Regions:
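Charge-dense, intrinsically disordered terminal/linker segments
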Residues: 1-207
């Protein structure tokens, strides 16, 4: 939000007023579906403001407070669902709170569990239930000794040593570059399925 009156710079970006950021990639699901897996959904701006409000250094109506202070998770999921529908993906999923707590070695466990296990499922159910969708447990395969990353030109496969093994236009074609000893684990995550009828409804009329 470069033209918002307030000015906030986070440690992640060199541009100001980034309201929310998402780190994600496309993974294979347990049933062969293409799943947009969210590894991180975060608002540095909102997090900083909430800390300042809790310490009495800021009021919710102050100029430095970001817009959508409480609504940013819902806004993030709307954008993610629109992107997934536009790309023709079969589902959107996100890691559990326990995965996030493990990643950050227990730091902010209460907030991570609240966001990933309660807030995101609640917002997805609110938006998708009228379209026949519901948050459920999905299985996704996560590589342990290689990586497949989406780029502007398709997909690239890397080894654990960060060596580029190959590139392709589609995820299916990129899999030919996975090493013979490549290994994946099946993780249970939160998610919502997006059948074709729901994708069309999202793109046609929104939420």
């Amino acid at each position: 939000m470069p033209y918002y009156p307030a000015s906030f710079l986070s440690g992640h970006f060199k541009i100001r007023n980034v309201l929310v950021h998402v780190r994600c990639d496309v993974r294979d699901g347990a049933d062969g579906e293409r799943v947009l897996l969210l590894h991180e959904v975060q608002s540095d701006w909102a997090q900083s403001a909430r800390r300042a409000i809790a310490c009495g250094e800021m009021d919710p109506g102050d100029d430095g407070c970001p817009p959508f202070l409480k609504e940013w998770p819902a806004l993030a999921m709307k954008l993610v669902l629109l992107h997934a529908a536009h790309q023709g993906l079969d589902a959107v999923a996100w890691s559990r709170g326990a995965h996030q707590v493990f990643r950050y070695e227990g730091l902010g466990a209460m907030g991570l569990n609240e966001l990933y296990d309660r807030t995101l499922p609640r917002e997805d159910n609110r938006m998708l239930r009228p379209l026949g969708g519901i948050c459920e447990t999905l299985g996704v395969f996560v590589p342990t000794n290689f990586g497949i990353f989406q780029t502007e030109r398709g997909y690239e496969v890397y080894s654990l040593e960060d060596e580029l093994l190959g590139a392709a236009l589609t995820l299916e074609d990129a899999r030919q570059f996975v090493p013979d000893q490549g290994h994946e684990l099946l993780y249970e995550v939160h998610g919502v399925r997006l059948p074709e009828s729901m994708r069309e409804a999202i793109l046609g009329s929104g939420f």
